[in-house]
Amino acid sequence: MSGSTAVALLFCVLSCSVWGAGSKASHEHNAAAAAQDVTLKVQVSDVSTHQPIADAVIEIFANQVSAASGTTGADGTALVKLQYKLGSQLIVTATKQAYVPNSAPWRPLRLPVFSSLSLGLLPERSATLMVYDDIVQIVSGFQGSRLQPRVHFQRRALNLPGNATYKDLAAFLTAASTPWEIDSFPYLQGSDGNSTGNNSRFDLTPVTAVSFHLLNSDGTDIPVNGPIYVTVPLPTHSSLKHNAHVPAWRFDQKHGTWLKSSIGIIQQEGSQLTWTYIAPQMGYWVAAMSPSHPDPVVTQDITSYHTIFLLAILGGIAFILLVLLCILLYYCRRKCLKPRQHHRKLQLSTALDCSKKDQATSMSHINLISPIHMEMLSSSGEADMHTPMLKPSYNTSRDFGSREELLSHQEEKSRMSLDNLTPSGTLRQVYNKSLDHILMKSRKSAEISEEYTSTMKDEYRRSYNSVICQPLFESKDKDLLSSTNHVTAGSKPNIQEQMHPVPSAPEPEQLIDRRSNECMMSRSVDHLERPTSFSRPGQLICYNSVDQVNDSVYRNVLPTLVIPAHYVKLPGEHPFVSQQLIVSAEQQFEIERLQAELSHAQQMQPPPLSAQAISQQHLQDGEGVEWSTQNAMMSESVSIPASLNDAAIAQMNGEVQLLTEKALMELGGGRPMPHPRAWFVSLDGRSNAHIRHSYIDLQRAGKNGSNDASLDSGVDMNEPKLGRKLRGEKLSMLHSSMQHPTLQEHQQLNQVNVSDSTAYTQLVYLEDMDQSPSECGTAVCSPEDSRPFIEAPAKKSGSQTPSLQEETIKRTTESSPLPLSSPEHEFNINDDSGEDQGENKKSPWQKREERPLLAFNKK
């Protein structure tokens, strides 16, 4: 069984082998029978002349392989025999020297008995050869306005044979400018040959074609090793666009096909389009599109196609660079400002140390008063142009970044202050608006001062008297009320008060006069100005000793200004005038007796009207009174050193103990120390030992019309004579009506109250409406000529003292009209005028040279 199966399998294998061999033999036989001998006649002629071309080489290619070849005779024909298989395509090519080769496909549908083919050759055009030192240029021989094809390459790329020279060279350049000329080039069948051998053939869509050669004298080609730059003008009917890319194909004569070599670009030269490419060698070139890329690849120029994108990128980069530059400048500015601020702080600390000792000087040590930081409201505008100005500096809690910011801030605040100082409504409405605050705050101030007086009256006494100026009210409206009291020369006294509203200051930063710390004091006498006035009328609190002035007083009556008593020139009728600075123990009994007599004398006579009472009586009774600048006369001002305004005073320095009562008596010659006529301010930061103090009759200097001031004086010497005389008349009428005792008796009677009690009085600021509007809110007068209406001292008793408002109302109801001025006062005025005539003979500089000099703190 097994043997028969094996025989059957063997028989099957043998049968398959025999059948395969037989089928292969039959296939080969059929193929051999299909390839038959075919004779092909090829006729070659000149395209331009149609003359036959002899000795032209005919070559037939089948699948890029030469199948047969032949040569034309004198008649330009050639008979070529070949094996042709039905269905295959043949490429018949004719070449001739000095002609552009041409080829044509041949593919019959059936096996022909006879076939003939004609090829026209395009003669190559001679070109102009230009050999330069660096390049070799070939230009078409046709000259004209239109662009001509051109070829150039480097001279060193040209390799001449050993026996050849440049004069043996001949150049040919042929460009197809018409479609029929393009047809004269070889058949446009492209091949994308690859290494696998599987070549695909396809037809090309031509754009233009060009042929260029460089031949030797024997007709051989001269090789060129290097890039060859070719530019060919395109036909006018071309539909290509600028920057379009068209492939460049080279004709391979060995295979009879076009091979892709490089990429050319379409460029615009004027109104003509050109195709430019780089050829690796000379030969036959065509610009054509392949079926895989039927349309030209148009590549837009990045500078035009992506303009917006590029601009956005550049803008972003510029913005980033700008931000980085700003940050760099910011940090550099901060680094530059830090050392400057540190240097300013060092200068400020040095200036503060010096100002503690040398801010202001007079007959005694003003540097015994230690300053603290205090912000003063500035309500004054521009100072009088005829007044020597001393510009004070104010330490504030705000630092300015630059000098420009400081100057602009000062201008803004000065303008704001000037605008707010102008009256915007009736004075009566402003007064009624603040009347309730005045009544309440005045009572509170009187009670507080009485409480401190009772607690400090048992303390030991010092030789100095302190004056504390407390504002009467501290409302958020911050209205400045300036009272002016006048007594006209008519039959009945006419007392009027003029008030000027001031700007409200809800925030300290808005109206505080801020100035740089470097400018502590101006060094020029031409830049002296009146010191900044108080914001509004306040309390004048007189203490017998500096020990009664403690920190608790400041906390209850802030803002406060403490001034030694001998720095203030009080009016002649004031009880503190010519008061001795030394009160010995032996005089204590006499003082108490005089105090009792003074109390009895005050009960017998009506008290004088205070400034506040006169103002209130006038506002209550004077309905319909016309406010006029002719009725308002400014009294002579009390000038305070500007440095005292800068540093609010808190405590007395320990050096006050060095000036004992005995030393003061020795300096005064046993007589009370005269009141100072001027303050002297250290403008250059020197110590008190280097400052000379002088005493000059500033009242006389003001009477002779001089507008000059001492270099070290802060006194306003520009007081009008008319204001002084009218003020003297008013005081004379008041004194005669109230029947005051003589000046010496009045001083002796009022010395009793100085020892134990604290007197409260209302500061009166009189304004001169004839001055510039910027001085409306500032009450300034010299200390010698100041004659405010001061209230009588309060009674010393254990009972509760009536408030200031109640006392004012009581005095107002009990007051009577004041008579006219007495003849005695008129006589005094005449004496003053006589003194003016005598003083006019001396110039201010002579009086300055004649003043006595006195130096303090000599060591």
Curated annotation (Swiss-Prot):
<keyword id="KW-1133">Transmembrane helix</keyword>
<feature type="signal peptide">
    <location>
        <begin position="1"/>
        <end position="20"/>
    </location>
</feature>
<dbReference type="Pfam" id="PF20771">
    <property type="entry name" value="FAM171A1-2-B_C"/>
</dbReference>
<keyword id="KW-0812">Transmembrane</keyword>
<feature type="topological domain" description="Cytoplasmic">
    <location>
        <begin position="329"/>
        <end position="859"/>
    </location>
</feature>
<dbReference type="Pfam" id="PF10577">
    <property type="entry name" value="FAM171A1-2-B_N"/>
</dbReference>
<feature type="compositionally biased region" description="Basic and acidic residues">
    <location>
        <begin position="838"/>
        <end position="852"/>
    </location>
</feature>
<keyword id="KW-0732">Signal</keyword>
<comment type="similarity">
    <text>Belongs to the FAM171 family.</text>
</comment>
<feature type="glycosylation site" description="N-linked (GlcNAc...) asparagine">
    <location>
        <position position="194"/>
    </location>
</feature>
<dbReference type="GO" id="GO:0005886">
    <property type="term" value="C:plasma membrane"/>
</dbReference>
<keyword id="KW-1003">Cell membrane</keyword>
<dbReference type="GO" id="GO:0043149">
    <property type="term" value="P:stress fiber assembly"/>
</dbReference>
<dbReference type="InterPro" id="IPR049175">
    <property type="entry name" value="FAM171_C"/>
</dbReference>
<dbReference type="InterPro" id="IPR018890">
    <property type="entry name" value="FAM171"/>
</dbReference>
<feature type="region of interest" description="Disordered">
    <location>
        <begin position="771"/>
        <end position="859"/>
    </location>
</feature>
<keyword id="KW-0472">Membrane</keyword>
<feature type="topological domain" description="Extracellular">
    <location>
        <begin position="21"/>
        <end position="307"/>
    </location>
</feature>
<feature type="compositionally biased region" description="Basic and acidic residues">
    <location>
        <begin position="400"/>
        <end position="416"/>
    </location>
</feature>
<feature type="region of interest" description="Disordered">
    <location>
        <begin position="397"/>
        <end position="421"/>
    </location>
</feature>
<dbReference type="InterPro" id="IPR048530">
    <property type="entry name" value="FAM171_N"/>
</dbReference>
<feature type="glycosylation site" description="N-linked (GlcNAc...) asparagine">
    <location>
        <position position="163"/>
    </location>
</feature>
<feature type="compositionally biased region" description="Polar residues">
    <location>
        <begin position="484"/>
        <end position="497"/>
    </location>
</feature>
<comment type="function">
    <text>May be involved in the regulation of the cytoskeletal dynamics, plays a role in actin stress fiber formation.</text>
</comment>
<protein>
    <recommendedName>
        <fullName>Protein FAM171A1</fullName>
    </recommendedName>
</protein>
<dbReference type="GO" id="GO:0008360">
    <property type="term" value="P:regulation of cell shape"/>
</dbReference>
<feature type="transmembrane region" description="Helical">
    <location>
        <begin position="308"/>
        <end position="328"/>
    </location>
</feature>
<feature type="compositionally biased region" description="Polar residues">
    <location>
        <begin position="797"/>
        <end position="806"/>
    </location>
</feature>
<feature type="region of interest" description="Disordered">
    <location>
        <begin position="484"/>
        <end position="509"/>
    </location>
</feature>
<feature type="glycosylation site" description="N-linked (GlcNAc...) asparagine">
    <location>
        <position position="198"/>
    </location>
</feature>
<keyword id="KW-0325">Glycoprotein</keyword>
